[in-house]
């Protein structure tokens, strides 16, 4: 057997560089690169190995570990989980800075490989700089924090362990059902330790993403339920986009059987916004058409959806409809006593359609779906078409969204909007028009503030030919903005629109909706410090990080600035002041947020009555 004598870190990087996959029919590297922030825990071992393979496996430098992980996650999401990236950090704070991002990937079922440095296996210099000492278990390090938010975790305490750990890691990262973050903790001394590895271990490999076929019996049961339905609705989740050919299969199924399609946050863009069977967004952030149809349906066909509370209205939206859940993951397919069909979305929809033959939804239901959907599109057009406001009135997010899309004639097909948290996810879910799969990039599983700008970098790396528009509130911007400098450094140009409502406007409105007084969310409601402070010049801040930037004060000025931003050669930030109170009133659904059972406040007591009414509507 021919062997190669390599350090553990050299073998690791060489193996990753040898992994390939198919993307749009082309063979490409499975790992597009490694994000790295070096410290004493990884610079000598992993850092040396990355330098040796810098051409085959590019290394990217960031300014914050959580942010670079979010960029990696967004890259994988933009590639519909068919390609991915790795992230390496030092031990201690570098490693734990990844934990929030690991949870983001875990919730969203997105692949990313974490390679944090770890403490010495030998324990000779124990405790080392930044080591977290556990008083009860000598084997615990900071990296044990990854275990609850990793789909697979391994600590490599001997170089030979890579021979089993790496194939397991690849298997999890590319498994459609188990897909999620993988963590390989790399002790500092073992990174540098040499071993005679079999040369065959590093042979180029083509990793194929499986498309599990559905069980015939499950298909028969689902088909029987559908044939008995008169008022069905499809709920398209992220699994439709992650399935190769899933969006096309969804369209063909809907057209063949005349079933309206509602989209979750993760599934939005699976069907073009103007398709006749597009009912629009569903759930708490949904529109009136999809929610009306979902509430009145006698059967819900959920395809690739986690059926989270925002999709189901905390399980109050679907009424008494039967639920058929198509999902590659049994954990998701069996939720809420659904009739489960385990399988890839594209394969399952095609097989289910073949069993249904000429069946279609009832004619009265088809007509109702068309009426509701047409009415919703008219509502959206009225909101996003607003160009002039009274001089004393600030714009709100819906009007800003309209301005963004008006500044490119093919925005629905050309732009990719990126967002994650705050007021914007609800407004974008309702109002953004996407004509191609992937044109709507919303991280709304973990809804992690700070994902937006870093995520935009990952999306731009995946799709350099498209305009990536990051829409972010002032709250999320202040959480994590350092990667503006990274985008300038890497040449990954973004158009960033900052909507400044001077605080956490979304949670302020929720606070008021549950009966409480405004408190500690908007700057004006903070009880500590001088009222109204601080006064933040976001445009000046963005310029200091290397971007082009300007502040505008009207929708007309915003459109002009966005034209300049689209024509610019580097990241361009446009800031506009927005109303923290106004939102799109059309649509929406009840969302369970616990309201105090007893309170001295009459408004809280009134909110409790509304809460109890919502509880009575929940499915049991």
List the model feature ranges, each with a label.
Residues 2-359, 403, 493-496, 537, ...:
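N-terminal alpha/beta PP-like core and its mobile active-site loop of ThDP/TPP-dependent enzymes
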Residues 123-136, 333-334, 341-342, 349-350, ...:
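Thiamine diphosphate
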Residues 149, 403-411, 542-547:
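A structural motif corresponding to the C-terminal end of an alpha-helix
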């Amino acid at each position: 057997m021919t062997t190669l004598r390599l350090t553990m870190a050299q073998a690791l990087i060489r193996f990753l560089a040898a992994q390939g996959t198919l993307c749009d029919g082309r063979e490409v590297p499975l790992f597009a690169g490694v994000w790295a922030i070096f410290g004493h825990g990884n610079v000598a071992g992993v850092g040396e190995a990355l330098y040796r393979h810098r051409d085959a496996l590019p290394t990217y430098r960031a300014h914050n570990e959580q942010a670079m992980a979010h960029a990696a996650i967004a890259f994988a999401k933009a590639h519909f989980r068919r390609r991915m990236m790795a992230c390496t950090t030092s031990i201690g704070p570098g490693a734990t800075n990844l934990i929030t991002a690991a949870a983001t990937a875990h919730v969203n079922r997105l692949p990313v490989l974490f390679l944090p440095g770890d403490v010495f296996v030998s324990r000779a210099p124990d405790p080392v700089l930044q080591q977290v000492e556990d008083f009860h278990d000598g084997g615990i390090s900071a990296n044990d924090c990854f275990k609850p938010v990793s789909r697979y975790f391994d600590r490599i305490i001997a170089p030979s362990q890579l021979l089993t750990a790496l194939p397991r890691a690849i298997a999890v990262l590319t498994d459609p059902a188990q897909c999620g973050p993988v963590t390989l903790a790399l002790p500092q001394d073992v990174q540098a330790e040499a071993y005679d590895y079999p040369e065959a271990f590093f042979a180029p490999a083509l990793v194929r993403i499986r498309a599990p076929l559905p069980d015939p019996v499950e298909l028969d049961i689902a088909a029987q339920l559908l044939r008995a339905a008169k008022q069905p609705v499809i709920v398209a989740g992220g699994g439709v986009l992650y399935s190769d050919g899933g969006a096309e299969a969804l369209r063909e199924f809907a057209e063949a059987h005349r079933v309206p399609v509602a989209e979750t946050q993760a599934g939005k863009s699976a069907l073009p916004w103007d398709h006749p069977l597009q009912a629009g967004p569903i759930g708490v952030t949904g529109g009136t058409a999809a929610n009306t149809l979902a509430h009145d349906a006698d059967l819900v066909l959920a395809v690739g959806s986690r059926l989270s509370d925002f999709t189901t209205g905390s399980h109050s939206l679907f009424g008494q409809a039967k639920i058929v859940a198509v999902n590659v993951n049994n954990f998701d397919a069996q939720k809420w006593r659904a009739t489960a069909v385990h399988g890839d979305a594209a394969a399952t929809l095609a097989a289910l359609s073949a069993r249904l033959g000429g069946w279609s939804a009832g004619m009265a239901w088809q007509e109702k779906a068309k009426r509701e959907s047409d009415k919703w599109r008219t509502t959206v057009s009225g909101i996003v078409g607003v160009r002039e406001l009274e001089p004393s009135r600030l714009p709100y997010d819906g009007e800003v969204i309209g301005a963004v899309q008006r500044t490119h004639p093919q925005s629905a097909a050309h732009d990719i909007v990126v967002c994650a948290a705050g007021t914007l996810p609800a407004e974008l879910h309702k109002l953004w028009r996407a004509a191609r799969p992937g044109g709507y990039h919303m991280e709304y599983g973990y809804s992690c503030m700070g994902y937006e700008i870093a995520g935009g970098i990952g999306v731009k790396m995946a799709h350099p030919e498209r305009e990536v528009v990051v829409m972010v509130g002032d709250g999320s911007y202040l959480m994590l903005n350092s990667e503006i400098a990274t985008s300038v450094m890497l040449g990954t140009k973004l158009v960033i629109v900052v909507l400044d409502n001077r605080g956490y406007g979304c949670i302020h409105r929720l606070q008021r909706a549950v009966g409480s007084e405004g408190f500690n969310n908007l700057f004006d409601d903070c009880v500590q410090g001088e009222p109204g402070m601080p006064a933040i010049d976001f445009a000046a801040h963005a310029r200091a990080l290397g971007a082009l930037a300007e502040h505008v004060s009207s929708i007309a000025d915003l459109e002009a600035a966005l034209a300049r931003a689209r024509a610019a050669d580097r990241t361009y930030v446009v800031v506009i002041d927005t109303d923290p109170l106004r939102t799109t009133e059309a649509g929406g659904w009840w969302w369970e947020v616990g309201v105090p059972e007893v309170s001295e406040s009459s408004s809280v007591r009134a909110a409790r009555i509304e809460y109890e009414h919502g509880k009575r509507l929940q499915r049991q």
